[in-house]
């Protein structure tokens, strides 16, 4: 459910982007609805609404959600202010690389890597597996950031589709691969598997 809620602003962005631009009047003001700039405005507004509602309900936002919201406001705001989609194209790479930096930094700061802090309450794994998993997430975010940057500046007509569905597909594939990997190692930390049989 949380992943779906986080996806709502991006989905609305995609829908508005795909609309043919058309003149619209609201409160006595005329503007063009549809295309990249209307979609960017929708992304900003819907992000504020969604994450604002989550904050009111839970009293806080997760760090990842806060980073996503701030990046949306900054890069989306710059896109509208300078009327240049270049700023928005940098949003996904920068966010992914900041996540990679956070995961990498956790190897040197604190007593647990970041993935263990996130998933440790639900899984018991050997420390070496946690470390490998954390490194895998670092690689995933680096690759996602690079892929988004490459597509955004190489395939002008395709980058929004990739931003929404390509990144989602990469995430699903990675999570499936992670599940397969974890299934091979969960028993390593299960005390019951190390007990001798009578």
From Swiss-Prot:
TM regions (residue ranges): 36-56, 64-84, 90-110, 135-155, 162-182
Coiled coil ranges: none
Keyword Membrane: yes
Principal place of residence: membrane
Lineage top rank: taxon: Bacteria
InterPro entries (UniProt xref): YciB
GO cellular component terms, A-Z: plasma membrane
Keywords annotated in UniProt: Cell inner membrane, Cell membrane, Membrane, Transmembrane, Transmembrane helix
The keyword RNA-binding is assigned to this record: no
Pfam families, alphabetized: IspA
Membrane topology classification: Multi-pass membrane protein
Location of this chain's protein in the cell: Cell inner membrane
Family per record: Belongs to the YciB family.
Function per UniProt: Plays a role in cell envelope biogenesis, maintenance of cell envelope integrity and membrane homeostasis.
Listed name of the protein: Inner membrane-spanning protein YciB
């Amino acid at each position: 459910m949380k992943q779906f809620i986080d996806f709502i602003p991006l989905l609305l962005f995609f829908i508005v982007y795909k609309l043919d631009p058309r003149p619209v009047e609201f409160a006595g003001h005329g503007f063009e609805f549809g295309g990249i700039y209307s979609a960017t405005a929708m992304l900003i507004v819907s992000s504020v609404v969604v994450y604002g509602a989550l904050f009111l309900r839970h009293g806080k936002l997760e760090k990842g959600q806060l980073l996503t919201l701030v990046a949306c406001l900054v890069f989306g705001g710059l896109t509208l202010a300078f009327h240049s989609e270049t700023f928005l194209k940098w949003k996904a790479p920068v966010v992914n690389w900041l996540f990679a930096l956070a995961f990498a930094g956790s190897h040197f700061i604190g007593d647990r890597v970041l993935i263990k802090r996130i998933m440790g309450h639900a899984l018991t794994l050997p420390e070496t597996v946690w470390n490998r998993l954390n490194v895998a997430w670092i690689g995933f975010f680096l690759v996602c950031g690079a892929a988004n940057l490459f597509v955004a500046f190489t395939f002008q007509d395709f980058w929004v589709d990739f931003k929404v569905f390509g990144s989602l597909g990469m995430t699903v594939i990675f999570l499936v691969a992670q599940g397969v990997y974890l299934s091979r190692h969960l028993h390593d930390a299960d005390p019951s598997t190390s007990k001798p049989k009578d």
